[in-house]
Amino acid sequence: IKMLEDLETYVKWVGTPGKAAIEYLNTWVKLMSPITPFIAEELWSLMGGHGYVAKAVIDKELTRGDHLFEVEQRYVDIVTDDIRSVLEVVGGDTVVVYTLDKELAWIAKKVAEEMLSGAEMSDIIRRLSRELTELGIRQPDRVIRTVHEVVSYLGPEKLIKYFETSKEFDEFSVLTKYRGLIVTRLGLKDLVVYRASDPRAPDLGGRKSRALPLKPGIYATSST
């Protein structure tokens, strides 16, 4: 039942099932084999599987895809909630978000590492404040507290694993990928995603400078 729910969630998020869905179904049938061998073999054959499913090896890439998707899903949940909060105050049906450069994602990674080491908030602030100040980031204490809150929701261990697998966390790419889902969830007419560092992107409402690690700057307006 849980696997079916996960598959349905995946389809809802991405719209059109792709390679990941096929790999997921393949793994599902492999897991069924010891419990319902005859049904599993029949399904395996219908899906074009080679040989006997009982001898098939479960792909380790499934685990990789799972934790990547989970972190991205939680991140999109956070951004969706932030957009919803802005809309409740200013209204509108068109939203523009500005993401921080992926090169600064190390800040979130560093906070996650500190959290896993058992460091207290005061220690994390003390260790990172100078680096953030040297980068020209204002109010480093507030930034670190905000990032700490988001990392707590994403799961520091899962976020570290995400970085180990993908080498980076590109908020722009993630939000662009799930843009359609956010539009549907919030009933928007449009959602535009920019990198805050993009000189070609209009700085609506001065929201470029509001972009923080894992917390994009958000501007809402009405299309009418």
Predicted regions and their residues:
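Acidic, turn-prone loop/beta-hairpin segments
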Residues: 1-81, 101
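C-terminal low-complexity, glycine/proline- and small-hydrophobic-enriched intrinsically disordered tails
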Residues: 51-224
